[in-house]
UniProtKB/Swiss-Prot annotation:
It comes from the Eukaryota. Its main location: plastid. GO terms for biological process: mRNA processing; RNA splicing; tRNA processing. It is found in: Plastid, Chloroplast. Signal peptide: none annotated. GO terms for cellular component: chloroplast. It holds the Pfam family MatK_N. This is Maturase K. Belongs to the intron maturase 2 family. MatK subfamily. The keyword Plastid applies. Usually encoded in the trnK tRNA gene intron. Probably assists in splicing its own and other chloroplast group II introns. One of its GO terms (molecular function) is RNA binding.
Length: 514
């Protein structure tokens, strides 16, 4: 694989056209076996694995030599009954073939990604999810509308094959990929990424995620150059915009300009403010302009999907939201822009006066109601927030019970430390303290009062002294209650917060039809 990448850097077109021979290399299936074994071992112990799932490289060599003699393709791996052919489990060898087909397209795509990163010297990778929020904090207040985009799900495997044609000219590899995609249609047909991973866990998660990421990358890689061209283009096309026409007419009636001088003067009117962020299957485009401009962008993006990917997305896939009147959910936060009024004293040489300065401020809030719903789903409380004891944890030691509740609380606080209002986090801590006390009371068959007298302030103090100091300072009354803290070590969303995010998406999806 490394040698192929080194050769590909010297002659990338030749490397793209001859990927199919990789499918006949035993080392490729050894790599696929490693991925399969690592994934399987995390779900079940070795003693529970079937004897038919034991991998044999000798069997792979026999199958490869048999295909070479028949001068066929990789289709017998997928469509034939492997149990009758070699006496092994068909699904197991199908997993290995899918893993091999995943590794082959990754070679040219990884080389292309390395070249693109080498050309972008200013590129810096931020792995933390919170790295998106400071960008939104800086740019969103200057925008008027957002386009909440959900990437349309694929409806046919041939769409992916056509996108691969742009980068891979090896026809046998494309035919093999087409056969696998038609055989395993549920690897790519799903309404969202969470459903895709849930379905693919029974088949091949690595191939599913690779196909989804490649498809999302294609959607972005074709849109971003259009935005860059729009940003660096001259302002002359703005004259054809409908919302600008009355403005031009007013200028023509007030001052008489020659047509060529009018166009030169309108160069200062150009104000393209387009900001784009993406997480999983959701994308946010922030625009500064009128509602008509936002509708035009939605129309162009929809037409773009139809022309390049032959997709007809539903209307709720692109939702226009006005920031001044509404909030939107993203990354487990409720985000909005609010007006902030400040009293300013203006001093002049002869006099001074006081006036109000109105500014826009980014306002992220932790969705307390949805978080309580997620806690209710996990049986920590009821739907109204009334605490419930965890009877399933009564068999654990006291330290384990305290540590589990403390870890849940620290994860919630750590992720939502950027919330502008900490009252909801206080409530979450109160809700979690009572189930912890009730669980300990049920274990020791005593009252909650006795548990509190026994443990005292040790509830939720299992974290390290440094973490306790950070939490104490964050909740200190001397600090601003609206101070936001973004962490650079959050690389994935907490499962409880992820459940909250999915629940909120289900609640707001019917509103997208308007």
């Amino acid at each position: 694989m490394d040698k192929l990448q080194r050769d590909g850097k010297e002659d990338t077109p030749r490397q793209r056209r001859f990927l199919y021979p990789l499918l006949f290399q035993e080392d490729l299936y050894a790599i696929a076996y490693d991925h399969y074994f690592n994934r399987s071992s995390s779900f079940e112990p070795m003693e529970n694995s079937s004897s038919n799932d034991r991998f044999s490289f000798l069997t792979v060599k026999r199958l490869i030599s048999r295909i070479r003699q028949q001068n066929g393709s990789i289709v017998p791996f997928v469509n034939c009954d492997q149990t009758k052919l070699v006496g092994h489990n068909r699904s197991f060898y199908s997993e290995l073939v899918l893993g091999g087909l995943t590794a082959v397209p990754e070679v040219p795509l990884s080389i292309r990604s390395e070249h693109s990163l080498e050309r972008m010297n200013e590129w810096t990778s931020f792995r933390s999810i919170h790295s998106i929020l400071p960008l939104m904090e800086d740019k969103i207040p200057h925008s008027n509308f957002i386009l909440d985009i959900r990437i349309p799900h694929l409806t046919h495997p041939e769409i992916l094959v056509r996108t691969f044609r742009r980068w891979i000219q090896d026809a046998p590899s494309l035919h093999s990929l087409r056969s696998v995609l038609h055989e395993h249609r549920n690897l790519i047909i799903s309404s969202n990424l969470d459903q895709l991973i849930l379905i693919a866990s029974k088949e091949n998660t690595r191939l599913s995620l690779f196909l989804w990421n490649y498809y999302a990358y294609e959607c972005e890689s074709l849109l971003v150059p259009l935005w860059k061209r729009f940003f660096y283009s001259r302002s002359l096309p703005y004259e054809s915009f409908i919302e600008r026409t009355p403005f031009y007419r007013k200028i023509e009636h007030i001052v008489i300009f020659y047509h060529k001088y009018l166009k030169k003067s309108l160069w200062f009117l150009k104000d393209p403010s387009i900001h784009y962020v993406k997480h999983r299957e959701r994308s946010i485009i922030a625009l500064r302009g009128t509602y008509l401009l936002a509708k035009k962008w939605r129309y162009h993006i929809t037409k773009f999907w139809q022309c390049h990917f032959h997709l007809w997305p539903q209307p709720y896939r692109i939702y226009i939201d006005e920031l001044s009147n509404n909030c939107f959910s993203f990354l487990g936060y409720l985000l909005s822009v609010k007006m902030k009024t400040s009293v300013v004293r203006i001093k002049m040489p002869d006099d001074s006066f006081i006036t109000d300065l109105i500014t826009k401020e980014f306002d992220p809030i932790a969705p307390t109601t949805l978080l309580i719903g997620s806690l209710a789903k996990e049986k920590f409380c009821d739907i109204s927030g009334h605490p419930i004891s965890r009877l399933a944890w009564t068999g654990l030691t006291d330290d384990d019970i305290l540590d589990r509740f403390d870890r849940i609380w620290r994860n919630i606080f750590h992720y939502h430390s950027g919330s502008s209002k900490k009252d909801g986090l206080y409530r979450m801590k109160y809700i979690l303290r009572l189930p912890c006390a009730k669980t300990l009371a049920c274990k020791h068959k005593s009252a909650i009062r006795v548990v509190r007298e026994r443990f005292g302030s040790e509830l939720f103090t299992k974290s390290s002294p440094k973490e306790r100091e950070s939490i104490f300072l964050s909740f200190s009354k001397t600090r601003s209650q609206r101070e936001r803290i973004w962490h650079s070590d959050i690389i994935q969303i907490n499962p409880l917060i992820n459940s909250c995010r999915k629940k909120h998406n289900l609640q707001i999806e019917p509103l997208f039809d308007r």
